[in-house]
């Protein structure tokens, strides 16, 4: 089924979502399953880059949400550490054997949890981490220990999502756009990127940077303030904005301490960039 009819079917299901349940069978269930399988395989994605920026496919988010209406929770015997779990969403690796993992081409360390409909590209390394429904992790990226990739988040190629970092999702609270981490980015330990923020290509976030849609991102060199996106090749650290009136509290912000171009980045390690 081409994408246009698939989209039309999902939009129609969304309008009558209250009628769906775990007892729903036939074409209604099949169309949602087709979308989830395509997301899982990476042939569809919730957000796509084009020449004029990113396009979010809302209908794919709707399909993910509809899947929760169509399934009851069940005991899952292959949870973290082999412990049983009880959930509506099966794990991506259910039933996988040596051949299936080798075919997929990525590594998943014990303790890595990926829910079905998330796409993991070849040459990804998953440390004990969590990747939620509808997310996409592209090739050459490492998701480090205790990092989380939220629902429908998009992680680019050759990124490093450091230990304990959080990449926000879109399903709860419902957000218009997923978090997007473009290619060649480094997200420092215990940082959080949420509420549809876009971290553009080649950027470096130091440890403990918190970014939401309303976070002010201040360019130290120019004074320019960005919100909702980190410009390409920025090096960002936590900071504070002074109060407008004496005696009032300062407000947290993020600070672009410098920019690097691709030539500089190719010759300079990430650690050196953060220690300037």
Swiss-Prot record:
Family assignment from sequence similarity: Belongs to the transferase hexapeptide repeat family.
Matching Gene3D superfamilies: Hexapeptide repeat proteins, Tetrahydrodipicolinate-N-succinyltransferase, N-terminal domain
Keywords from the named record: Acyltransferase, Amino-acid biosynthesis, Cytoplasm, Diaminopimelate biosynthesis, Lysine biosynthesis, Repeat, Transferase
Functional pathway: Amino-acid biosynthesis; L-lysine biosynthesis via DAP pathway; LL-2,6-diaminopimelate from (S)-tetrahydrodipicolinate (succinylase route): step 1/3
Name assigned to this protein: 2,3,4,5-tetrahydropyridine-2,6-dicarboxylate N-succinyltransferase
SUPFAM superfamilies: Trimeric LpxA-like enzymes
Biological-process GO terms, alphabetical: diaminopimelate biosynthetic process; lysine biosynthetic process via diaminopimelate
Compartmental location: Cytoplasm
One CC-aspect GO term: cytoplasm
Entry's Gene Ontology molecular function annotations: 2,3,4,5-tetrahydropyridine-2,6-dicarboxylate N-succinyltransferase activity; nucleotidyltransferase activity
EC number, UniProt record: 2.3.1.117
InterPro entries from the UniProt entry: DapD_Trfase_Hexpep_rpt_fam, Hexapep, THP_succinylTrfase_dom1, THP_succinylTrfase_N_sf, Trimer_LpxA-like_sf
Keyword Repeat attached: yes
Presence of keyword Zinc-finger: no
Lineage: Bacteria, Pseudomonadati, Pseudomonadota, Alphaproteobacteria, Acetobacterales
Quaternary organization: Homotrimer.
Chain sites annotated for binding substrate: 107, 144
